[in-house]
From Swiss-Prot:
Family named by the database record: Belongs to the complex I LYR family.
Cellular component per GO, a single term: mitochondrial inner membrane
Record text on subunit structure and interactions: Complex I is composed of about 40 different subunits. Belongs to the peripheral arm of the complex, most likely the globular part.
UniProt xrefs under InterPro entries: Complex1_LYR_NDUFA6_LYRM6, NADH_Ub_cplx-1_asu_su-6
Originating species: Neurospora crassa (strain ATCC 24698 / 74-OR23-1A / CBS 708.71 / DSM 1257 / FGSC 987)
Subcellular location(s) of the protein: Mitochondrion inner membrane
Major location category of this protein: mitochondrion
Sorted UniProt keywords: Electron transport, Membrane, Mitochondrion, Mitochondrion inner membrane, Respiratory chain, Transport
Origin: domain of life: Eukaryota
Cysteine disulfide partners in this protein: none
Name of the protein in its database record: NADH-ubiquinone oxidoreductase 14.8 kDa subunit
Summary of the function given for this chain in its UniProt record: Accessory subunit of the mitochondrial membrane respiratory chain NADH dehydrogenase (Complex I), that is believed to be not involved in catalysis. Complex I functions in the transfer of electrons from NADH to the respiratory chain. The immediate electron acceptor for the enzyme is believed to be ubiquinone. The precise function of this subunit is unknown but believed to be important.
Membrane topology, from the record: Peripheral membrane protein
Signal peptide: none
Length: 124
């Protein structure tokens, strides 16, 4: 599978108004959702496509109430950069699984949260 670094590249720009920003956010969201099956096969994720799409939606919902246009533009730029890194296979499976703490093969609680908890569990 040849990698073309500029295949998913998009030039950065500022949104003219809120409707333009909304259109750009929906376009980015659709790009992420449409590429979910390809991401699952590329990274051999042991998760169904519906779980991956739900997690993508949660990431977009986290920034739903941002009310400053320059902040939305920065989030769009970061979203496009993440999409490009993901689709060009510049990440590893552990990077992708870090978004899924509940389903992660590493486990959410690897180390105790405090010294006392670790001491009582017999860990260093």
């Amino acid at each position: 599978m040849p990698i073309t670094p500029t295949k998913y590249a998009i030039t950065t720009r500022q949104s003219a108004n809120w409707s333009d920003a909304k259109r750009r956010v929906f376009a980015l969201y659709r790009r992420w959702l449409r590429s979910t099956p390809e991401m699952q096969s590329m990274y051999s994720l042991p998760l169904p496509i519906s779980v991956i799409r739900t997690r993508i939606r949660q990431e977009f919902e986290r920034n739903r109430f941002v009310n400053k246009l320059p902040v939305v533009d920065v989030l769009l730029t970061k979203g496009h950069a993440d999409y490009q890194e993901t689709m060009n296979f510049w990440r590893q499976t552990t990077h992708m699984m870090s978004y899924f703490n509940e389903e992660s093969f590493r486990g959410a609680k690897r180390l105790p949260s405090s010294f006392i908890d670790g001491f009582l569990q017999g860990r260093n």
